[in-house]
């Protein structure tokens, strides 16, 4: 996988022509990242708490996450704001911070597992462009890896609404091979939005009665107090299941 850099880009308007020289700009900002003279933010990452000395203006305008964190971060005796990211590996953050400063993505030597975890970190930092890029890399060049871990990938993608492309990729597969999802051990732990996204599709290759059986199974699992035998249920038990499946039931009525 080759690294990505923003190169020279041209556009023409009705009035004039402008030339955008991004590569030099990118290189200059990467030099700024290495410049330790004017930093005003200290970020610690990884188990070893490696320190990154960075600049608040760059972080604030490149990432909504850092914009919010900087607003509440306290200053030390040297007037530096401190942010603790010890749950993020140093290797991951080195890639993230180079993207934030220079718009470069250096992942050519990384495997699919690392790229997937990096994508989740990019989601945390609300870096939409980077998330989209990493999604594309996984789907286009690591689809076999995704398929081998399909249940985990599916569940994770629907736990984060930023992963729209990955959600669609997963649902396209489930529409053709529904047992891949419905027969998985993790099915009952899937989020409601995943179930809803499938019911909304008109190309799901499964009979409605069978889909409904799985929906009931999922609904029961969301209520730990419910027995798997409906004949033993009280009126309160039925009401609890009805409340759990309220949104899903409305979709069945609408798409029927």
Indicate residue ranges for each PLM-predicted region.
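Intrinsically disordered, low-complexity acidic/polar segments
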Residues: 52, 63, 224-225
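Intrinsically disordered, low-complexity boundary segments flanking structured domains
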Residues: 27-31, 68-73, 160, 185
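Post-BTB helical module
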Residues: 95, 101-214, 218-255
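N-terminal BTB/POZ boundary and linker segment
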Residues: 2-60, 87-113, 196-197, 201, ...
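Short, conserved non-catalytic motifs in the polymerase core
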Residues: 73-86, 119
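A generic structural signal for short, non-catalytic loop/turn and secondary-structure boundary residues
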Residues: 36, 76-78, 241-245
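Residue-level signal for pocket-adjacent positions within structured domains
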Residues: 27, 65, 78-80
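Short active-site loop/helix that positions an aromatic residue
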Residues: 57-71
